[in-house]
Amino acid sequence: MDLAEYKSRYGGRDDAAPGWDAIDSRVREVYPGQEPKHWGTVIKHVIGGPDPIDGISAYSCTDGGIDHLHFITYGYTSLYYDEEAAGGDYSRFGFEMTFRLASKLPPLEEPMWVCNLLQNIARYVFKTGKWFEPYHWIPANGPVRADHGTDIVGLAFLTDPTLAPIDSPHGRVEFIQAFGITQSELDSFRDTKQTAEAIVEHHRKTNPLLVTDLSRKNG
């Protein structure tokens, strides 16, 4: 899309969010007719808000053999009207983050800790300028959910199994999923005994959508 077409289609609208709309369009293909649970910030990051991610949506999913919530961020990419971003190769960082949490449907509690986790990952990316690609990994420096006592203490990253990349008006957007890993798996990465790719693909055999289960034990 060239700048003239961009201005013609989106210009003059105070609420224009072509990047956000493009993400919504892709997600609706996967979850047609479903109204997600959504958490938004009070002040958008672009105008000085403290949280880098402006919104997080969660969809109920029963695919892959595990009931779960599928979280999707809005904030790593250019979401709002921006003539300088129009027609780019990649939209800002070029990805949005996703996360799948094993959960009863509907969930018994508000999973706000997931929103905090995703915001903390984004703070790292925005502060350092370093982004994640499939089969990268990071330690969480403790349980991913502090009040749970879970053995999940790190994250590996992969291409989201169901959300295909999109070409938004601001450039390409990929969907990178975080998957919870245990201390022994982190240790195997550090000792180069196994790669993150090997661990992810091992779990994919029995957990095709790579749903994070907080009850999964170390070992």
In which residue ranges do the predicted regions lie?
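Acidic, proline/glycine-rich low-complexity IDRs
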Residues: 1-93, 97-219
